[in-house]
């Protein structure tokens, strides 16, 4: 990393907004910003172990607050980035399940030939939802758990099945669609089981004296930064 370079370590769901904010900041200031994306469990492990060389971290609120409580981020430096809804994705041309209620979603999961979600925090919620529906054992033989959110869409894209259902963050699904992946954002989860994940940025303690990083955080929290995030699907 260059001496004047700012590094962001972020969860995957807000990745497009984080990247575009970073690019806009660089355009304004000339200061280069690099970014890396990881799942929330990896963020916890990396930052918690003191092995993170980034200046700024963007994580789910609960994770970000744990970082602050553990002294890994500067107290009071955080700001809400935005929120993302969990959603359903399928391959283009596949059967389209009814997402109108929790019960129709449950039946869609039971009748699907394959169910795909990730091991990150968003996927952990899906596993919990399925457990609360009482169908974990019934579908155990047809579940695929991927490492990342993007891997869910990659799996669907490569699949020959016509009745397969995947889950992920709406923003991540849209990123893959924009890249040309042959998948569809079918819709968000029904209201009864809706999942909204909120993300927060913060300054890592090792960069407490990095004024440029502080300025980037301020930009991310500004009206201009928030408009950039909203334009990428964050709410």
Task: Explain the meaning of each model-derived region.
Residues 1-36, 41-48, 55, 61-70, ...:
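Exported/periplasmic ABC-transporter solute-binding proteins
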């Amino acid at each position: 990393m260059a001496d004047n370079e700012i590094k962001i370590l972020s969860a995957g769901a807000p990745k497009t907004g984080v990247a575009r904010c970073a690019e806009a900041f660089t355009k304004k200031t000339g200061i280069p910003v690099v970014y890396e994306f990881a799942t929330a469990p990896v963020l916890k492990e990396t930052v918690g172990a003191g092995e993170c060389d980034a200046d700024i971290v963007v994580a789910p609120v609960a994770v970000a607050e744990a970082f602050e409580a553990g002294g890994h981020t500067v107290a009071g430096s955080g700001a809400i980035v935005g929120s993302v809804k969990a959603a359903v994705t399928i391959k283009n041309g596949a059967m389209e399940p009814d997402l109108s209620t929790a019960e129709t979603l449950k039946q869609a999961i039971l009748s699907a030939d394959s169910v795909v979600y990730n091991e990150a925090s968003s996927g952990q919620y899906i596993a919990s939802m399925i457990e609360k529906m009482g169908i974990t054992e019934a579908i155990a033989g047809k579940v695929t758990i991927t490492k990342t959110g993007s891997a869910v869409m990659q799996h669907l894209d490569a699949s020959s099945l016509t009745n397969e259902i995947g889950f992920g963050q709406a923003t991540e699904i849209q990123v893959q669609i924009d890249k040309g992946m042959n998948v569809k954002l079918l819709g968000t989860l029904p209201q009864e089981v809706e999942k909204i994940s909120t993300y927060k940025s913060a300054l890592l303690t090792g960069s407490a004296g990095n004024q440029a990083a502080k300025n980037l955080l301020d930009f991310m929290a500004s009206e201009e930064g928030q408009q950039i995030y909203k334009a990428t699907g964050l709410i």
